Amino acid sequence: MALILERDGRACVWCGRAIDVGLVEATTEHVVPRIKGGPSWIENEVAACRRCNGQRGHLTPGEWLEECERRGWQPNRQALVRALTALDTAIKTHGGQRRARNYARSQLRRLTRAS
């Protein structure tokens, strides 16, 4: 978790709150959910506060990012694009993960098109 927090600036990628300080508990969240074939690799995990991790539910990264913006939060689109790009590269390197690759690529297209 320490590497992920350091990489993501010790802030929740969804709401922008500083995490792992005081009352905001740090978690890591799978960008591509395990139920969608997402591996438990560092490339597929981002820093998230417990609230955002729990509230995202089964929304895609693109859907949850839009919801976070609607709520007036400050999601880190660049961190999500970076994670999805890194995951795609890792899948190319390691092989397999067809479901996760397709999901990651579709979300990457959505996030880069909307920016």
Region spans (language model):
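Generic anion/oxyanion-binding catalytic loop in active/binding sites
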Residues: 1, 34, 38, 53
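Short cysteine-rich loop/turn motifs with clustered Cys
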Residues: 1-26, 49
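Histidine-centered nuclease catalytic patch
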Residues: 16-45, 62-67, 72
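A detector for short metal-coordination/catalytic motifs
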Residues: 43-44, 51-115
